[in-house]
Swiss-Prot record:
Function: Involved in the regulation of glucose homeostasis and lipid metabolism.
Record's keyword annotation contains Transmembrane: no
GO annotation, cellular component aspect: extracellular region; plasma membrane
Disulfide topology: none
Keywords tagged on the record: Secreted, Signal
Gene: Enho
Subcellular location(s) of the protein: Secreted
Any one GO BP annotation for this protein: positive regulation of Notch signaling pathway
Species in which this protein is naturally found: Mus musculus
Protein's name according to its UniProt entry: Adropin
Length: 76
């Protein structure tokens, strides 16, 4: 019985493994959710650029401005 592991050590090893596995699973789910959300926003912006930005305002396209608006400042 030289390889006997105490019950407390066995419980600690199992719990640490479960916590690590759950953290890894949570990280994968978050990455998948963010990736699929950004892909949905990209497909929406390609199909209809005038549509509402949707659930991700940080990915919204910038408002369209006339290109000659800033040229007045450059001319003397």
């Amino acid at each position: 019985m030289g390889a006997a592991i105490s019950q407390g050590a066995l419980i600690a090893i199992v719990c640490n493994g479960l916590v690590g596995f759950l953290l890894l699973l949570l990280w994968v789910i978050l990455c998948w959710a963010c990736h699929s959300r950004s892909a949905d926003v990209d497909s929406l912006s390609e199909s209809s650029p005038n549509s509402s930005p949707g659930p991700c305002p940080e990915k919204a396209p910038p408002p369209q401005k006339p290109s000659h608006e800033g040229s007045y400042l450059l001319q003397p």
